[in-house]
């Protein structure tokens, strides 16, 4: 795996790289599953300091697999358990109001690359699932994206970016 791809695939390392370049990063905390099992109270306190609502994510997966939007403290533990079922490294970040989600897939290597057109997801108030993004399950919104179902080739890297509305 190329170093750029490896860095980009780990959400915690990517945030640290962005911070070191003085780029804005939402407030977040991260932990390993064993740390959560050994000291749940400290982890929950750190999450509370980030401030609700938060997004709980497996740190090294893409395509919205295992991601949960948590609006209040009462739902945080089930969201963490969901994320832990996919990865042993978890990132919890502040949710952003009025965000724009932009999706693109990249297939290839150093000799050949194919990039799908950028896709801005419209008309949704919630985070998209894997099905929403790739199988056309757009949560019932007619203005939402049809997903990337037309790009049925195997993708090696998914690039998900969030652009902030000013």
Q: At which residue positions do the language-model features occur?
A:
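Phosphate-binding site of ATP-dependent enzymes
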Residues: 71-154, 158, 162-165
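Active-site nucleotide/adenylate-binding loops and adjacent lid/helix of ATP-dependent enzymes
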Residues: 5-100, 110
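Short, acidic/turn-prone active-site loops that include or flank metal/cofactor-
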Residues: 2-5, 122
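Short, contiguous strand/loop micro-motifs
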Residues: 1-2, 66, 163
């Amino acid at each position: 795996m190329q170093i750029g791809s490896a860095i980009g695939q780990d959400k915690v390392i990517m945030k640290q790289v962005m911070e070191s370049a003085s780029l804005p990063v939402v407030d977040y905390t991260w932990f390993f599953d064993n740390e959560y099992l050994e000291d749940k109270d400290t982890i929950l306190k750190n999450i509370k300091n980030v401030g609700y609502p938060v997004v709980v994510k497996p740190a090294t997966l893409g395509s919205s697999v295992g991601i949960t939007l948590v609006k209040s403290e009462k739902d945080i533990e089930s969201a963490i358990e969901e994320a832990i079922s996919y990865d042993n490294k978890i990132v919890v970040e502040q949710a952003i109001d009025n965000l724009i989600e932009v999706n693109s897939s990249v297939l290839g290597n150093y000799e050949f690359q194919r990039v799908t057109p950028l896709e801005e997801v419209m008309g949704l108030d919630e985070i998209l699932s894997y099905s929403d993004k790739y199988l056309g399950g757009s949560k019932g919104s007619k203005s939402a994206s049809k997903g990337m179902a037309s790009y049925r080739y195997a993708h090696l890297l998914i690039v998900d970016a969030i652009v902030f509305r000013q």
